[in-house]
A protein has these predicted regions:
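N-terminal hydrophobic targeting/anchoring segments and the immediately downstream early-domain regions
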Residues: 1-118, 122, 171-259
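Charged catalytic cores and adjacent phosphate/nucleic-acid-binding surfaces used
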Residues: 155, 166-167, 252
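Alpha-helix-loop-beta-strand connector modules within alpha/beta enzyme cores
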Residues: 29, 119-134, 151-161
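Glycine-enriched alpha-helix->loop->beta-strand junction motifs that scaffold or abut catalytic
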Residues: 97-99, 134-136, 154-160, 186-190
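Catalytic beta/alpha-barrel core
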Residues: 136-143
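Short, well-ordered alpha-helical microsegments
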Residues: 85, 146-149
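Short, catalytically relevant binding-site loops at active-site mouths
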Residues: 145-146, 166-168, 197-200
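Histidine-centered catalytic micro-motifs
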Residues: 143, 161-164
Length: 259
């Protein structure tokens, strides 16, 4: 699975929740890392940092794993605001960070994200070059359209979209267009389907619409998965992204999800 680190920097006057200094955002992500490391010491998780480790862990789960087999995880950063400067990227890589999504919501230090406009910042372009050098995977989720196409033109390393649905089914900037999905498929990316209800069904109004009103069920996500399969002509690019990480509850998930 993907284990996420996340902490947003916000400038004064920005209404989004976050921290007013990148250094504090960095400290927040290090607390999250400490939790994952504690879970690993307890034998519940196993961090995957290279192909050899991934192969070994997959083999464990494919060959009658014990009941207490640890869950393997790849460490990923959602929104790069907490990377204070590029020297911090080296430090993060040393702790096992293997994927970064430069954007999240609103304006970002490296890239604007959901609800914002524009392309990569100058610092963002340098970040992408350093990701390329280190072999850090690009998570395209949350990128604006402009940032998406810009980054695809300057980065040729591994790509995925960790939690992403289809704009042709749910019209919104947060989803990807067919052209973007085709580009990800061309890049051999994996696209994780997101289970946030407003991304699953059209016309959702946050804080007002309910899953029951829309008939949003777990099976609804199959429409998005199938759409990606039809574009790709194969199932190999589809995964479960979920996004069910505690940021919202059953008021914003499929009506038959009870946990």
């Amino acid at each position: 699975c993907i284990a996420t680190q996340i902490a947003r920097y916000v400038a004064e006057g920005n209404s989004l929740p976050g921290w007013h200094a990148p250094e504090i955002a960095w400290a927040q992500t290090q607390g999250q890392l400490a939790y994952y490391q504690a879970m690993e010491r307890a034998g519940q998780m196993k961090q995957i940092v290279d192909r050899a480790g991934l192969k070994k862990h997959v083999e464990l789960w494919q060959n009658n794993p014990p009941a207490n087999a640890p869950i393997g995880f790849v460490l990923s950063l959602e929104g790069a605001d907490s990377i204070v400067d590029l020297s911090y990227l080296e430090r993060a890589y040393a702790t096992g960070l293997r994927a970064i999504g430069p954007a999240h919501y609103g304006p970002g230090r490296y890239s604007p994200g959901t609800g914002a406009e524009g392309g990569l910042t100058a610092a963002g372009r340098e970040l992408v070059k350093e990701m390329q050098r280190l072999g850090i995977c690009l998570d395209a989720t949350h990128l604006t359209d402009d940032a998406f196409w810009e980054i695809m033109s300057i980065y040729d390393g591994p790509v995925w979209a960790s939690h992403q649905n289809c704009r042709s089914l749910v019209p919104h900037q947060r989803q990807f267009s067919d052209e973007q999905l085709k580009e990800l498929i061309r890049r051999d990316a994996v696209i994780g389907a997101a289970f946030d209800a407003w991304m699953m069904v059209p016309g959702w109004i946050r804080g007002k619409t309910t899953p029951q009103e829309t008939g949003c069920k777990i099976e609804t996500i199959a429409l998005h998965i199938d759409h990606v399969c039809q574009l790709a002509g194969t199932t190999r690019h589809c995964a479960i992204g979920s996004d069910l990480d505690g940021g919202f509850g059953t008021e914003q998930t499929a009506m038959d999800l009870d946990s």
